[in-house]
A protein has these predicted regions:
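Conserved phosphate/anionic-ligand binding catalytic regions in large, soluble enzymes, centered on
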Residues: 27-50, 153-172
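Acidic-glycine-rich active-site phosphate/pyrophosphate-binding loop
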Residues: 10-25, 134-145
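Amphipathic alpha-helical interface segments
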Residues: 90, 94-163, 167
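Transmembrane signal-anchor/signal-peptide helices with a preference for the extracytoplasmic
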Residues: 51-63
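Preference for long, well-ordered alpha-helical segments
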Residues: 139-142, 154-214, 220
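A structural-propensity feature for long, helix-poor, extended segments
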Residues: 60-100, 199, 206
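Amphipathic alpha-helix face/heptad-repeat signature
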Residues: 40-44, 72, 79-86, 125-135, ...
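Short, small-residue-biased leader/transition segments that mark boundaries at the very start
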Residues: 1-8
Length: 220
């Protein structure tokens, strides 16, 4: 269908300049929307975490953590690559759902095929942001280490990374929840719903833990 082929015709979001990307978000098209922005927040968090690690490697007084910082830099860059792919994946998942809604529904057979296709595409549209949320939460543990043990001159950058990662988790989970609302597979819904609730709680707690610590450290 033409909507499905639009997925392949559309320019990759990640190849746009920052200005072009923001203009696209501000446009009247529903994608890129919150899901792609959640993935972008994850990519920003990863990039900042890598930066703080790289600013620590080879610095006097941080020799003890050199190996850990090299590891963190590698992990963060790997995560960044995954989040960058998810910026487009989220918009493509939306396009798939939209394409299914345009399927013919003249006969009972067509109606059944359309309904099944919508359900499957919606499941996928919930699973894409779910993975973003899981990855962003995993990244928060890495950020915690880099914030506590990394270069003190870059500690606020690590805090911004933590806030961006929390935004990625919570934003992605919003997109999970909106897709769960129209699914008939109650077992699938309940499983993702409880994982989403737990991830949200854990992400907020981890962010608060770090920010409380660092705000204490920065007090004058």
């Amino acid at each position: 269908s033409s909507a499905a082929s639009d997925v392949y015709k559309r320019q990759m979001l990640v190849d746009l300049t920052v200005k072009e990307f923001l203009n696209k978000v501000a446009g009247s098209d529903p994608v890129p929307g919150g899901g792609s922005i959640a993935a972008l927040n994850g990519a920003i968090a990863s990039a900042l975490a890598a930066m703080v690690a790289n600013l620590t490697i080879g610095k006097k007084g941080y020799e003890l953590h050199e190996e850990l910082m090299r590891h963190i830099s590698g992990v963060a860059l790997q995560q960044k690559g995954a989040f960058v792919e998810d910026i487009d994946r989220d918009s493509e998942a939306y396009d798939k759902v939209f394409a299914c809604f345009k399927m013919p529904k003249a006969t009972d057979e067509e109606k059944a095929a359309r309904s099944t296709a919508i359900q499957e595409a919606t499941k996928f549209a919930a699973l894409v942001p779910m993975q973003v949320a899981r990855n962003a939460y995993e990244l928060m543990t890495v950020i915690m280490d880099v914030a506590r043990l990394g270069n003190r001159n870059a500690v606020t950058d690590a805090c911004v990374a933590m806030m961006s990662a929390r935004s990625a988790v919570l934003g992605a989970l919003m997109n999970v929840r909106i897709n769960l609302g129209s699914l008939k597979d109650k077992e699938f819904v309940s499983k993702l719903q409880s994982e989403a609730d737990e991830l949200e709680h854990l992400a907020c707690a981890k962010e608060k833990e770090l920010l409380d610590e660092i705000n204490q450290e920065l007090k004058v």
